[in-house]
From Swiss-Prot:
Its main location: membrane. The chain crosses the membrane at residues 9-29. This is Cytochrome c-type biogenesis protein CcmE. It comes from Salmonella typhimurium (strain LT2 / SGSC1412 / ATCC 700720). Heme binds at residues 130, 134.
Amino acid sequence: MNLRRKNRLWVVCAVLAGLGLTTALVLYALRANIDLFYTPGEILYGKRETQQLPAAGQRLRVGGMVMPGSVRRDPDSLKVNFSLYDAEGSVTVSYEGILPDLFREGQGVVVQGTLEKGNHVLAHEVLAKHDENYTPPEVEKAMQENHRRPQRADKDTSS
């Protein structure tokens, strides 16, 4: 092997090593920003495909319904404790802050936070789901004013 090919081989190896190191560093940096979505049942029994349980201390998002009768507010602060449930189980959630206006018992919510021991989620953010059928009053009024029924396709309009 001549000197020119040997130098080219070293350059290619250095570039590949640099790309590998860059990829590893990017993935390591993004690891802290990945929040996996779980339901309460998946926290208790694991993901359906892998049966993998989330670890205590893991950042995650949990989606479920607020269990009726479970909301407990601290009278001296903004702390709120409640339970999220689905068809397979429930988990407790603690949150300190102002809850969304649409938050209420029996309503769907998504909480983002950290899983603690005992299937307890320390939430940093609470997002309330709104009704997918909701239409603002202004839009509904405009739709009613501009609504025309389409003609039936099977009706003969030539006569």
